[in-house]
């Protein structure tokens, strides 16, 4: 439905005939799709939103493109509404699905269901599709199935070029490119664990090495188990930590004083540990304490000095990740069973030299405790360290061009793009752009919690308001442009 609408509409709407605001969103995963919806609901009949996505999966992005129904969300369905003012929106959509589409999904009244990422991607596509066909948004949202490769200043706005050679003149642009997959496959080594062939064509009895022990590793193990892999699976990381299991817990009240967030990591850690001890003494679960931090995480992060953030990334991030980003119970049970029978092992080690050999690769493991290096063999090594955040290593031509021109710069922690508190990108000279923005995982270094739906949905709402504050409607000026399919 989405692709058909796009191709039917793009031939007949020359931009020079439009006098409203023209806003481009680059990337159509959750962040870009939801930002588009909020912009459409806040703009008038002459305004246009162009949603640009290089893949065919509008609304899915990297995270929700998984075709494996056993790759589950790590947030309960009751917390996964795309709209903060409609907390049951996702649950209502689930309950309205035909039984044959719900598959094994069980939506209970306690809202604790964990559904597949594949199904959640369908939910986002449903939202996008309904917006396209609504009377209020008709002929105002255009899906461009192409890769944005360049963005150049043009008058008061930008000229956006796509790989197919077309250019679009827009008043503002938002970068919503989500997570960048790692690149650099080699013989016996898979850099991108989300690629379709990551676990394909393996001897079912062959040893596999996974580098990383977080949620990406968990998904990869589930994929291997689903394809009846019987061979040993070794997962390594410097600390050997495994994500904790979700559990049903009663909510814990917010406990940090408003406006008095600690400015040192030591003080913050002391406060949280004390609250966990207090909660435990009352018979409550540590998970509830960690979850109660969600409304405050953005302010906590922004309040920490740069040196404290760097200290967090060096020393505490792995511990935070495994306690904050937990496994769905059914997934945790499968991982635990694989550990109990010895098929899955988790060790503290670092990856050393890889030497291709017949039938696989010889791997040098570097123990973290000073023990001598160890040589093992595996048919395949799969990188499970998560998305690529170092922009200097990202191959996307748009990002490379924006960095080279100085239009954007990496944040000081090298986790993404530096932006203002409102989401305007910061250029190489340190100035906030008037009409270039970023949203979602690209802004992780500034806001930290920008990878989960409950956080991104609020960010998209705020950014939509800010964009429209910065980009005033045009009165009568026609803007020349090239537009169409040929």
Which ranges hold each PLM region?
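Flavin (primarily FAD) cofactor-binding/catalytic cores of flavoenzymes
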Residues: 6-56, 60-62, 105-262, 270-473, ...
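N-terminal glycine-rich dinucleotide-binding loop that anchors FAD/FMN and/or NAD(P) in oxidoreductases
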Residues: 67-89, 253-267
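Short, amphipathic alpha-helical segments
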Residues: 75-91, 284-297
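A conserved beta-strand/loop capping segment in the N-terminal third of enzymes
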Residues: 85-109, 298, 302
